[in-house]
A protein has these predicted regions:
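N-terminal binding-site loop/beta-alpha segment at the start of enzyme catalytic domains
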Residues: 2-89
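Surface-exposed, interaction-prone regions with an acidic/low-complexity signature
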Residues: 91, 98, 105
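Active-site/binding-pocket entry motifs
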Residues: 18, 96-97
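Short beta-strand segments at enzyme active-site cores
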Residues: 52-56, 89-93, 129-135
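Glycine/proline-rich, positively charged
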Residues: 101-153
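Generic beta-strand or strand-like secondary-structure segments
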Residues: 74-78, 93, 113-120
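Glycine/Thr-rich phosphate-binding loops of Rossmann-like dinucleotide-binding domains
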Residues: 32, 61-63, 100, 140-143
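Active-site-proximal loop/turn and secondary-structure-junction residues that shape catalytic pockets
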Residues: 28, 57-59, 94-96, 134-139
Length: 153
């Protein structure tokens, strides 16, 4: 049961998940914002009825090898501290082919890479599930406008 707030909620696709119409973006935590600031923002968001939170393995922004996954770690630390994982509808993303330091670069959307990305995110987030898992950036050789170039692996 969601806390009574002025927030509006919608069903997420064809699921039974009810998400707030405002989503908390987290991409600055670990670079531009500290863990303390991230905790304050998560507490405030949840108090206002914002239960839909977005993150990604590549965060914090700007992406750097030294801060890869830092935002997910901050969220995981908050989950561990507050025990409120069940109050949040969490979205995360596997990054696309963009950085050599992320599993060697290359095709990030193959089965092996997606599995490794998901397992890494779950560990950093200190949870056993992510409600919505997405592809962050398209692979440019994916089929489009009738042209073929995608190779399934």
């Amino acid at each position: 049961m969601l806390k009574k707030t002025l927030m509006n909620y919608k069903k997420l696709g064809k699921t039974d998940l009810e998400v707030s119409t405002i989503c908390l973006g987290t991409m600055t935590w670990g670079e531009q914002n500290t863990q303390v600031e991230g905790f304050e923002q998560m507490d405030f968001a949840l108090d206002q009825g914002v239960n839909f939170w977005d993150t990604a393995e590549i965060y914090s922004i700007p992406p750097r090898e030294e801060t890869f996954g830092s935002t997910e770690k901050i969220i995981g630390n908050w989950f561990e501290k507050t025990k409120k994982r069940d109050k949040v509808i969490l979205a995360s993303k596997v990054c696309g082919p963009m950085r050599e330091y992320v599993r060697g670069g290359g095709n990030q959307f193959g089965k092996k890479n997606i599995t490794e990305a998901l397992e890494g995110s779950l560990k950093r987030l200190k949870t056993d599930y992510i409600d919505l898992y997405q592809l962050h950036w398209p692979e440019r050789n994916t089929n489009f406008f009738g042209k073929l170039g995608y190779e399934h692996n």
